[in-house]
């Protein structure tokens, strides 16, 4: 053994060839600060070996290196700029020394090589991969850019266009694509990986492969003519500006850095990467996006722990076909759980099956499946007008009309047709689960399962625990949602549960702004362009359905009369009374016509202004700051109340539900991350300016306490002390 660290070791393999093996305790290899330091020590040992002829890098895990240790990021981002820059210089000196070894090097890459893992293998001369490879640089999705030389080496290896596509979009690619663009040199079966890598090393050692020529382009300026450079970088900057926008600075910074570094050799190019990385790491956007990643891991880990002792349902059923039922049936069948889809009429069943077939055909068009797979999946969805097969199902989700009487009748009837241990769930969006449970003989086997539309796209499923729902019931439904590829978040029961309960105060803020003379077009523009929502409130209401919102608004008002009961006729009432229900009937705040792809496209409709004038004060101008404050304060206050009342368990789960269920702007990180970034004292000052607008603007006592003591909702993070000898940087 030449060297043994906590996460890697170095040993002779054969005949002057050494192997450096990543072997972190636990299930995956991560390139954390300690591993980078350990890698530097191992390379120091290699530099002393006079009889070294070649080096093989490999992993003892199912994946090569999944990336940097993102749990370190938040504390690393608090390190002062100069110190963080120094540490990056140190880390890059380690990869440079790997790249500069006086012998050929190869990485045998299996499974994932992402982020720092990808940057590590870019420093070797050759890369041999297995068919399950996923390799790429996802850093821009976390609000940063590659910091271990990825923005320098990848463009010089692949050419500017291919590298920009991966780096700016935070993409990863599979084995075939990696081979095609030159990111790996070969693909072999897993059992041949080490043998194949040694064979390539031997060819390089014997002079059959010119490893020095392979290495040289990575040390030099990027070989691009002025015209080629202008075309590549201008197109890339235009596309990034269009897709990422001003709220996500990392992609455009990465492109500009690669452009600026193109004319320099490795050392100066790495200095430019360093100078760009450090300011990005100190942005609120980076902290928010890393926070989302960590919250996502927390939520998924919680679901895994919750379901460890239950069996995932093997057969499911959906009550109520149509678009929603068809979407749920498709998602279940697509992920391998056969489903019976029941309705009371053929027309709805046909609609449900058509929806499932349409979604599968899209997968076929994209080349994700072939005709055989399509037929196989669709054959596991069984449409029926009766309860045939219900005695075999493990879980049933009801997705009928949002009417408590109808839902109770359907659930009570279904309970008599299934096994005593079958779990029932309701896909209600607002009706309390404990109220629906009153119709059942086995309320302990019942809970809520709130999907979001469109089911195949929206990652969140709210799992609602009723007063009598058993732990096993919750666990089984969480297991099914996870199997469907969804992110399940368990919430306690109340009108609207969590997501809709906090959404309707936001809509109330919108209604009050309209009542006071604000224009809906400006509100939408501000909430989309300035705050960052994917849709403004008017457009969102059109998509949700004005009739749906009108009904839900009444349910929420009955549930929370003190805050949500309004004493005036609002815009939602005016449009509802005029039979303007949004996209579903082509008339809402906008008029809708189908484009060439059959998607609804919004157009101006002056009739709306006349309708709104009847429920509004004369038009007046509002600042962007006031619009954002008046829209967001009611929502954030309600989010805080939900945490204080135990409707949602943690800030992490609340923020993920908002991001995954409502599209809360990821660069803000969710309501609690936004609160922490703003500071609760500053938020309190802002909210107090609008207290005269009513109870929705009154800040909950718990948040007032946070403001008094300057306490954040997320645990405070201490700056990291990166491992590594900064003197060698």
From Swiss-Prot:
Q: What residue spans carry the region label 3-hydroxyacyl-CoA dehydrogenase? A: 311-729
Q: Where is this site: Important for catalytic activity?
A: 119, 139
Q: Tell me the segments the record calls region Enoyl-CoA hydratase/isomerase.
A: 1-189
GO MF entry, a single one: enoyl-CoA hydratase activity
GO cellular component terms listed in the entry, alphabetical order:
fatty acid beta-oxidation multienzyme complex
Pathway listed: Lipid metabolism; fatty acid beta-oxidation
Q: Which UniProt keywords apply?
A: Fatty acid metabolism, Isomerase, Lipid degradation, Lipid metabolism, Lyase, Multifunctional enzyme, NAD, Oxidoreductase
User: Please, one GO biological process term?
Assistant: fatty acid beta-oxidation
- State the EC number(s): 4.2.1.17, 5.1.2.3, 5.3.3.8, 1.1.1.35
Q: Where is NAD(+) bound in this sequence?
A: 324, 343, 400-402, 407, 429, 453
Q: Which PROSITE patterns match?
A: 3HCDH (PS00067), ENOYL_COA_HYDRATASE (PS00166)
Subunit structure of this chain's protein: Heterotetramer of two alpha chains (FadB) and two beta chains (FadA).
Descriptive protein name: Fatty acid oxidation complex subunit alpha
Organism, by scientific name, is: Escherichia coli O45:K1 (strain S88 / ExPEC)
Lineage of origin: Bacteria, Pseudomonadati, Pseudomonadota, Gammaproteobacteria, Enterobacterales
